[in-house]
Amino acid sequence: MLKTVHQKAGRHTRPVRAWLKLLWQRIDEDNMTTLAGNLAYVSLLSLVPLIAVVFALFAAFPMFSDVSIQLRHFIFANFMPATGDVIQRYIEQFVANSNKMTAVGACGLIVTALLLMYAIDSALNTIWRSKRTRPKVYSFAVYWMILTLGPLLAGVSLAISSYLLSLRWASDLNTVIDNVLHILPLLLSWISFWLLYSIVPTTRVPNRDALVGAFVAALLFEAGKKGFALYITMFPSYQLIYGVLAVIPILFVWVYWTWCIVLLGAEITVTLGEYRKLKQAAEQEEADQP
């Protein structure tokens, strides 16, 4: 495959161009945009149950009561640009209604949230082309760990942010703390994507490749937030067409765009390792020729 890629790129093609061709080939073969659409659909169905489960976990720990409020504002300000306030109001109403549900309904919420985890697992292993399967109990443990530890780690990071803000009275630390707080969303995105690419696939993922793919995804995610917010602000066509319902297509487009970025980071991670292996195989083949 690599030999064909090099031939198409030209005899003296640089490795970066050959890798980009391989990346594009994999994106096309994996139908990445279709996978992103499927995940966006499942995410919208699972959004309220997932948030309900997350904040129910915070409610179980009184020490995180203040952090829970900060986490809500942080999520909607940094992960849902432009329309975060409107979406936050609607979702908080839905979550408040879900608190009135019975035990059977609560179990249904948890199952729906876990279905999103399963969809993510399936999509990433499709990209990694891994046919290995985990035991059901182990898969459930991984999904539950993501549901529980993810929000708690986010709560701890916000507690650290609050502590850093409390130190801003010291003029010497002002600039340093501002810089740390400015890059915190990027850092959290990078760590989250790295954990996703490292833990979810059922095959071994080189740590360096996962870090590179996660960093590219984090950069695109941060740039996407700013670009999407700018588009919504400068070209408010959705508001003109849909009126008060504009939040629905805006949310769907943003969720779809987010999953495109997540899956692109996964494709980059996979392609780095695959290109390295194919290059070694091609070099070995040339060395074996008389």
Swiss-Prot record:
Location of this chain's protein in the cell: Cell inner membrane
Entry keyword set: Cell inner membrane, Cell membrane, Membrane, Transmembrane, Transmembrane helix
Chain ranges on the Periplasmic side, renumbered to this chain: 65-103, 161-179, 231-243
Domain of life: Bacteria
Cytoplasmic compartment residues: 1-43, 125-139, 201-209, 265-290
Bilayer-spanning residue ranges: 44-64, 104-124, 140-160, 180-200, 210-230, 244-264
Gene Ontology terms: cellular component: plasma membrane
Pfam family, one: Virul_fac_BrkB
Lipid bilayer topology: Multi-pass membrane protein
Keyword Translocase: no
Family membership noted in the UniProt record: Belongs to the UPF0761 family.
Protein name: UPF0761 membrane protein YihY
Organism of provenance: Salmonella typhimurium (strain LT2 / SGSC1412 / ATCC 700720)
